[in-house]
Amino acid sequence: MSKGPAVGIDLGTTYSCVGVFQHGKVEIIANDQGNRTTPSYVAFTDTERLIGDAAKNQVAMNPTNTVFDAKRLIGRRFDDAVVQSDMKHWPFMVVNDAGRPKVQVEYKGETKSFYPEEVSSMVLTKMKEIAEAYLGKTVTNAVVTVPAYFNDSQRQATKDAGTIAGLNVLRIINEPTAAAIAYGLDKKVGAERNVLIFDLGGGTFDVSILTIEDGIFEVKSTAGDTHLGGEDFDNRMVNHFIAEFKRKHKKDISENKRAVRRLRTACERAKRTLSSSTQASIEIDSLYEGIDFYTSITRARFEELNADLFRGTLDPVEKALRDAKLDKSQIHDIVLVGGSTRIPKIQKLLQDFFNGKELNKSINPDEAVAYGAAVQAAILSGDKSENVQDLLLLDVTPLSLGIETAGGVMTVLIKRNTTIPTKQTQTFTTYSDNQPGVLIQVYEGERAMTKDNNLLGKFELTGIPPAPRGVPQIEVTFDIDANGILNVSAVDKSTGKENKITITNDKGRLSKEDIERMVQEAEKYKAEDEKQRDKVSSKNSLESYAFNMKATVEDEKLQGKINDEDKQKILDKCNEIINWLDKNQTAEKEEFEHQQKELEKVCNPIITKLYQSAGGMPGGMPGGMPGGFPGGGAPPSGGASSGPTIEEVD
């Protein structure tokens, strides 16, 4: 396949989206189910691995082996408070592997464990394949987005996930920055504009303030809540209906995982309906102990169930304004991002907060981030179209960076919301006489004492010549590149001795070897998935052949054209094969093909004889199946070997 353009991927907590910039505009690409967003879900079963819609659709039947929310684990330590509290809510197992979290599942009858990077890489592989199917070309270059909050280790781990998926990640950019780009292309303005981006997605909430002037973006502040989103609104509705079920039927369904799962799916659907209608009905057959649950919910009730959560979205807005030192009257544009911003009540609260100002909803909120990432991908891969040329992008550091000085004090070198790339240098000295070395400990965070901040890494600068305290001069430099990767160096001015560290959070990082191993495993899993698809297709082919052949010889139009002995021969063989199929659903591809050849050996001579005597058979042309068997009876039945297999799962 020829090489395709660079794509933009919004790797979301609950859903992901991919876009490409071509023919002077961005196209958001639909997956094989026709959806423009794909669930960030990976499921493992006895026979196969599923990614995206297929994984999410079977979650009710296979909750413990269906992994989602990998974005909440990526780049974190197992003992991170976030990981510990999230684990309580997940149906899948998270285990501790030398201080790093891994998800543990049953796959093809074995216990397997995967790093979050691997799970995210599976979702990225899916997004890559979606783009390739649409473009008909191989896709390798991509821009991938992350929340403005992500610290260094989370950004780096996301980049690793891209590498494992076989992508060359051109750049990791902040989601609000991407949304701003999507928006910046639509509105060319000369004067400086302050833009507030309100991003309420499936699992997270981010508010960012940017200024745009002459095509240059600058992020002024970011705020938000990593644990607020559409899923929380679903949960409120789920709890409401669990209580209603208790009242109506005196039964508690909350312990029955499958019932709750089915109820949650229905609630998510109802929530979406309530963004356009004032009421929604829910009908679930045999929800619990054979009881059907038919009920409805109004928009007003939904708003009341979530009143505190909806109102709470304004707190980060106020914080972002404070950090950017702006008054709400100074915001020129408000941009909505994330599916949950479709909720009318949220739009109203935000609009009222900004004294009736119109909101920008022109960009589909689910797609805005991928849209901007696609534009950025085009810029970075050297797209020359003028739509793209006038755009420059400045990203920021989400948290302050500094080192620990005497007494455990955090001394900041790079303040949060500093535009990157950036470089800052400061001179330090020794704390005691004849001190032979200094320990440079690098932290990120906003607290005054380092113990309350996050340690990124540390190194020692030794060999300082003996001198009284305060005499040696040690120059410390913090340098952040465009990808947000941090280099810290320390030089002793008198000797020129230097030591440095690249903070890619190695304790949370995968080693080169790990990544390479995972790339190979990803290839292996992909090959297994292919093999499984081929197997199913040869099984379906055999099944269709047997049933169609049976139907053909039993067709009354053939009465008298085929002698009973031949007919019986075919029927016996077909029934034998159908019985074999029932018992051997999981046989190998070769076995299905062998059975098909055996069946053809019996059928082909008889059918050929029929043709010669009848000069072509009534009612059907030869079907396009291996062995070209005739289609039966009235409607010619073609081979169903490669047709879609549709299964309804609640």
UniProtKB/Swiss-Prot annotation:
Omega-N-methylarginine: residues carrying this PTM: R469
Extent of the signal sequence: none
Residue positions where N6-succinyllysine is found in the record: K319, K512
Binding positions (ATP): 12-15, 71, 202-204, 268-275, 339-342
Region annotation (Nucleotide-binding domain (NBD)) ranges: 2-386
Quaternary organization: Component of the chaperone-assisted selective autophagy (CASA) complex consisting of BAG3, HSPA8/HSC70, HSPB8 and STUB1/CHIP. Identified in a IGF2BP1-dependent mRNP granule complex containing untranslated mRNAs. Interacts with PACRG. Interacts with HSPH1/HSP105. Interacts with IRAK1BP1 and BAG1. Interacts with DNAJC7. Interacts with DNAJB12 (via J domain). Interacts with DNAJB14 (via J domain). Interacts (via C-terminus) with the E3 ligase STUB1 forming a 210 kDa complex of one STUB1 and two HSPA8 molecules.
Protein name: Heat shock cognate 71 kDa protein
Originating organism: Bos taurus
